[in-house]
C-alpha cells in the first residue's frame, strides 16, 4: 500500500513539474545520470553522418547565392546522395537473403532448436530487415538489435492467451548509447525511442544493465513540446524535456524488471570494421565515410555545378531594348512586337550607342566532359577512402552513378572490406540468437512439443554462413578444395566447414553418410561380380551357343 502511494506521489510530481516547467528540463540524454559523456561524438559525428545519409546537411547544402534582387539569397545545393549509395551498395554485398543461420546441438537430422530460432527470425522479418539495418550501421558507424518477450492485448488491455512471442528491434546508432563495455563487447546500454502525440514528443529510455548475475531492464519517460524541425540540423525531438509518468504513455510497461539465469545481454551492438580514429576510448564505431567527408562535399559541389551548367548555359539572344517595345501598326492599328516577349531565349539590353543596336547570339559552350572527369576523379578517391576497389563507382552522363558488378577476387580491396564487416555481423547474429534462446527458456516457451528450456540445457552451436556467390566463383572454391584434399593438404571436414558452410556436427554427419554410401556401393559391386561368376559356372557354353545361333540367322537372311 505504501509503495503504491509513493508511486502516485512521484507520478503527480513528475506530471506537475512537466506541465508547469518547475522540474529540471533535460536538453539531451547526456545530461541524464549514468550516461557517458559521448555528446561530442554524437553531435559532431553520428548526427552529421545521419544527415548526409538522409541526403541533406544544412551547413553544406544550403549555400549563399546572391542575386541582384536579393544579395542574401540562399539556395539548396543539388546533391548526388553518394553517402546513401555507398552504404547501400556495400550492405548488399555484405548481406544476402541466401545467408544461412545454423543452430546445431547434435549430429541428428532433427534440429528443433534451429527450427524454433528460424521461426522467430522469419516472423520478425529478419532476412529482409537485416540488410536495411546493415546499411544504416555502415552509414552511422554502429547499431543494435534487441530481443524481448511480448504478449498481445485486446482493445480493453487484457492479455490474449497463447499470444506471447519473441520480438526483435533494430536500432540505429543515434537510438542507442552504450553505458558499459569491455574489450570484447558492449554489455550495458540505453535505448532511445520517440513518438509524437497531441503536440508533444514523448521519449522513452530503456536501460539494460548487469548487477552481478542479475540483469535489469528499467524504463523512464520524458516529454517536450512539439517544435517545427530544422532540416539538416539538430532536430527538435532530440531534446528530452521533462520527466513524465511512464504509465501515462505506456500503461502496460513495467518500470523495473529483473531477470536471473541469463548469461548474455538481451541485445547485440555491432559496429563497422573500421577503427575509431575520432575517439579511441569509445566502443562506438565510425561511419564508412567518416574520413571521406571532404570528398563527399566536393562531389556535391561538382554535381551541383554540372546541373547548373545546363540551367545557366541555356541559349540567350541579346537584342536591343528598343526592339522589344510594342509599336502600333499604322495600317491595322494593332499592337505588335518584333520579337516574342514570352520566349525566354531573348534578353533585352538597353544602350545609347548606335553600334550596339544589333542582335547577338550569346550561347555558352557546355563543359560536360570537364564535369564528368572531375566527378569520376572524386569517385575514385572515395573508393579508396571507404574500402572499395578502384573503379567500383563511376559517373556517366547518360546513366548517372554506376556500380561495377564484376566477380571480386579474394585479393581485391572490396572483398577484404566485405569480409571484415561480415565478421562483425556474424558475432552480432550469434549473440542475438543466444538472447532468443535464453528468453525462450526464461518464459518456458514450447515448440512442436519440445521445451526450449530443456533443449537449451543441452547447449548449442551457432554458425552464420554468407552466400559469397556474388563475391567470388563458388565452383573455383570447390575445385580448389578438391585439389587440396586430393594432395592431402586439407581434411574433408575442414573443407566442408570453411568452404561449404557446414557446422562441425553437420560435417561429421555428412562424412558418415558418405562413408555408408561408399560402403554400400562397394558391396553392391562385389555382389554383382559374384553373381556373374556363379552364372558362368552354371552354364559356361551359353554365350558360344548364342553366338552360333546369331551366325546361322545371318546365313539364312543372306
Kindly give the residue locations of the regions a language model identified.
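Short amphipathic alpha-helical segments
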Residues: 109-113, 122-130, 137, 291, ...
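Extended, helix-rich architectural segments
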Residues: 1-197, 546-558
